[in-house]
Amino acid sequence: MIIQQNIGQSFQSPIVRILLGAIAIALLYVLWREVRKIPAKLFTLMATAFVDMLGLLMIIPLLPFYVQTLGGSGFDVLGLHFGIGMIISFIVAAFTAAQLLSAPLWGRFSDRVGRRPTLLIALGASALAYLIFGFAHSLLVLFLSRIVQGAGGGTVGVIQAYVADSTDPKDRARALGWLSATTNLGVALGPVLGSFALKLGERDLMPGLATVRMGGAAPGIMAAGLCLLNMIFVARYLKESRDFTEQPQTGEVRRTSTQATWRVISHAREPASRLIWIYAIAIGAFQGSFAVLALFLNARFQVTKETIGYFFMYLGAISVFTRVLLLGRMVDWFGEANLSRLGIVLLAAGVLGMPLSGNLGMLALAVALIPLGTAFTFPCVTALLSRVIAARDRGLYMGMQQTYGGVSRIIAPLFFGWAFDHIGVSAPYYFSSAFLLATLSLGFGLDQYARPGRLIAPEAAGLKVKASEAATEEGET
């Protein structure tokens, strides 16, 4: 209880608030100087990703309330009662499943027709999904809207492929860090805009003439409007990044998304497969342990819903500025492979340090290592993946990375939740650090692909297959 009081009292002190304000202004100034260095093409993409994430996060925090309004206390099917919690879980799972299944397909589609038209189609699907969400009058329609949204939202790999197309290999980790900082900003502002939309929905839009209110449809309508504006922005300003001059060599055919997805499992020692596994295991270990974070902080440090916001504000601030200000310089000094290893170690140390912290100062130090670790790990792993695959297959493999990472994000919280309940409140963080450190064994030998100008032979990464091999595989299936 003392820690909780210290947190609350510290932020109510005028001196602390003035100091935090001064630091914020200084950091914003430095941030603006860095933003001005971003190439115009990437700045356009970052604006697109920011608005897309802004619309998505307008809806997600409100979803449970819409389900509660439409579902009441739940319903019975074949003698089984499905409560509100279970219904929300199914709707969230439907979105995730649609996103995971669509990610490699969107990636391969973008390899064939281009990144720009793929993003335009996906944004159109998202706009439709938001409108369905806004005007949903039943759980079935709400469920349908989340499937459409998930299918249209599997384009993270396409955006990452655009970055890889548009940057030199040595600058990709820096650019991916900028991109993730932008989406983090959308995550922070989206819920606020969603709450504003709800209040706007209660107002009469035509006072004195007729009563026109958007009501509960306001967040969906505003999110759809953002998507349409984003489509216009992309159509007008975003240039195609895909180079269609590269062609497969004679006697070789390109793998389908199904073949490539299975190859990550069947040829797990290949560089591309190892990088995808590193990403999937690490992001599952990190985000899975954070699924029970609020419960852990409450049990160990008496942090409540009134004070946990300070925790995430601290975490988010370090994350954004690390990705924008530090990541590029650290890549120049260490290289992607070494920096990703350092990131894994820092992330594992931060996660492990939380249950070992005995006071507020130690907790603050441990937590500070986590955004450093994520900033150094995930952009560097993705940048390395872009090096070991052929340009014409980037969309496919970036999409597969998101698919495997998504599966990990589904499975890991279930395991860590079980560990929290049945082993102990600190158990998820011990397991998480162990899984993170285990990924270091998958990174041996990847340094060669981080050297300037060094690209792996495509056939060594398993990206191309001879026609005879493809025919054999088709015959076996």
Locate each region found by the language model:
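Helix-to-loop junctions at the C-terminal end of transmembrane segments
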Residues: 102-113, 322-336, 420-421
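Conserved MFS/SLC helix-loop-helix module at the cytosolic interface between two early adjacent transmembrane helices
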Residues: 100-137
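Juxtamembrane intracellular "pre-TM" segments in multi-pass secondary transporters
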Residues: 32, 239-278, 299-300, 463-469, ...
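Short amphipathic helix-loop junctions that connect adjacent transmembrane helices
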Residues: 62-85, 291-307
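Cytoplasmic helix-loop-helix junction between adjacent transmembrane helices
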Residues: 145-183
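Intracellular juxtamembrane helix-capping segments at the cytosolic ends
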Residues: 155-167, 376-389
